[in-house]
């Protein structure tokens, strides 16, 4: 679907691209960076920087396009993925992050090395690199290539390569701090354009009352009956936590943002801030899809809901901002993935075989970023040949990767008795089981009707692996290092007590309880 752009729209896009590169080059020239600067932003990030950076990384093209599609076809039920996230952000802030900072880690695999030993560490290094390359980079480039080619009528692979080159350039130049600062800039663009689009669509419909009356009644139900084939309350309440624990508490691309916090307090408030932003996300991402259903239900496919609203409702000038928002969401997702891949590969792979000073690590990190971008283009090409939509691919990939990591990290943080051998059995054996199951699921083998919903599949795999780690733990003897975490760096602690943070989470919980009641 081609979107006709005027000169003013191209001017807006040009200003956006220039601003993006200015931020990257400016940060590179300001000062000589140390190892922590390029990989963890110098561990100086404040709560609002962390929150906006998490928002922009999370609000990728999948959210803008996928959530509008979900709103068009299903209604508010997709809001569950946003309005339940606060529980797992709370877990990250109050339970996982203190332990991560105490250990002084730079990457998530380093935590497993301290908790469960070298073999678990080796597994997660490889697993993290594969997950970043496939889930964050390959799928994002594929989705972004589809968007760019659809808007500008360019060939798909040319669009994918353009996105990869642009994101890799300012990521390699500026490191994590450039990713964070461009993330703040891009968060503002995404929120502003989404609010504008929502307001224009609501105005076109005739207001909130017209929207309520124009969509089917079940579009306003947040938790659907257990018999619902698509998004039953059982699938969401049981399956989403499996994915969310991995995504919010153990994924390198997400956790790296809070590891870069100035201190524990800033990291905790950053997680609280993004949890609060989650309240508005369905209003500006899912509700526009519902409005598109009212306006164009007989002529539009769900996957085209966002682009359709942009094409038909947004005037020139503002149209450039909305297209910039799509590109911003795409760029930040890709740049976050590139920086995370570079961090893990440089610090957990290259540093094991070669002694490097900060300057050497920085040079290596830049080259790894460029190499990761090239590999991701190849993965995106394979996705383009798979015959499946990018939304289906991303859902399947996350549900495959989540169960073993969710089990091992929960045990590692909350169960001191869990042993190294039990973690290794779940990671290596469970990882192979999940990957094999996921491949069969994606290929619909032995048949499409054989497989449950992808969230329920995650639950079943999680329960099997949870039982496995318990059984192996009780039949194996703990090693001397099991459960020990030796701090590697001095981490600044927040002054005073933790009650202000807990008060913030309590207020948020009450607000979310009211929202659940409203859409029950």
Predicted feature locations:
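Membrane-embedded helix-loop-helix hairpins and adjacent transmembrane boundary segments
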Residues: 1-520
């Amino acid at each position: 679907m081609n979107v006709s752009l005027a000169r003013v729209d191209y001017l807006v896009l040009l200003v956006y691209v220039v601003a993006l590169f200015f931020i990257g080059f400016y940060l590179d020239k300001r000062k000589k960076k140390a190892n922590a600067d390029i990989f963890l932003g110098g561990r100086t990030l404040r709560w609002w920087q962390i929150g906006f950076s998490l928002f922009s990384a999370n609000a990728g093209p999948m959210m803008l396009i996928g959530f509008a599609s979900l709103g068009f076809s299903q209604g508010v039920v997709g809001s569950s993925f946003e309005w339940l996230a606060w529980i797992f952000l709370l877990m990250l802030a109050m339970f996982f992050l203190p332990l991560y900072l105490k250990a002084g880690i730079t990457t998530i695999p380093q935590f497993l090395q301290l908790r469960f030993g070298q073999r678990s560490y080796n597994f997660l290094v490889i697993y993290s690199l594969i997950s970043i390359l496939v889930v964050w980079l390959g799928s994002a480039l594929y989705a972004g290539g589809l968007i760019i080619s659809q808007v500008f009528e360019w060939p798909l692979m040319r669009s994918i390569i353009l996105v990869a080159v642009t994101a890799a350039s300012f990521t390699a130049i500026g490191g994590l701090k450039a990713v964070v600062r461009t993330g703040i800039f891009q968060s503002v663009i995404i929120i502003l354009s989404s609010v504008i689009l929502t307001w224009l669509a609501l105005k076109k419909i005739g207001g909130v009352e017209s929207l309520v009356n124009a969509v089917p009644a079940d579009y306003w139900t947040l938790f659907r009956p257990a018999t619902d084939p698509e998004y039953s309350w059982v699938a969401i309440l049981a399956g989403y936590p499996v994915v969310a624990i991995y995504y919010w508490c153990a994924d390198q691309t997400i956790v790296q943002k809070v590891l870069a916090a100035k201190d524990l307090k800033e990291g905790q408030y950053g997680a609280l801030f993004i949890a609060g932003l989650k309240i508005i996300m369905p209003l500006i991402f899912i509700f526009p899809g519902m409005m598109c259903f009212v306006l164009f239900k007989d002529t539009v496919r769900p996957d085209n809901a966002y682009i359709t609203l942009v094409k038909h409702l947004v005037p020139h000038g503002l149209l450039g901002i909305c297209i910039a928002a799509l590109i911003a969401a795409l760029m930040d997702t890709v740049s976050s993935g590139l920086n995370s891949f570079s961090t893990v590969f440089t610090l957990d792979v290259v540093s094991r075989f070669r002694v490097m000073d900060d300057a050497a690590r920085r040079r290596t990190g830049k080259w790894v970023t460029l190499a990761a971008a090239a590999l991701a283009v190849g993965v995106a090409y394979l996705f383009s040949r798979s015959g499946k939509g990018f939304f289906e691919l991303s859902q399947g990939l996350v549900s495959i990767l989540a169960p073993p990591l969710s089990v091992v990290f929960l045990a590692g943080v909350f169960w001191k008795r869990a042993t190294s051998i039990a973690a290794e059995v779940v990671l290596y054996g469970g990882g192979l089981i999940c990957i094999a199951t996921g491949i069969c699921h994606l290929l619909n083998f032995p048949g499409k009707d054989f497989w449950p919903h992808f969230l329920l599949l995650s639950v079943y795999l999680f329960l099997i692996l949870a039982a496995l780690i318990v059984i192996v733990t009780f039949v194996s003897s703990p090693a001397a290092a099991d459960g020990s975490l030796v701090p590697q760096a001095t981490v600044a602690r927040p002054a005073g007590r933790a009650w202000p943070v807990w008060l913030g989470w309590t207020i948020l919980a009450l607000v979310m309880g009211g929202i659940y009641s409203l859409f029950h």
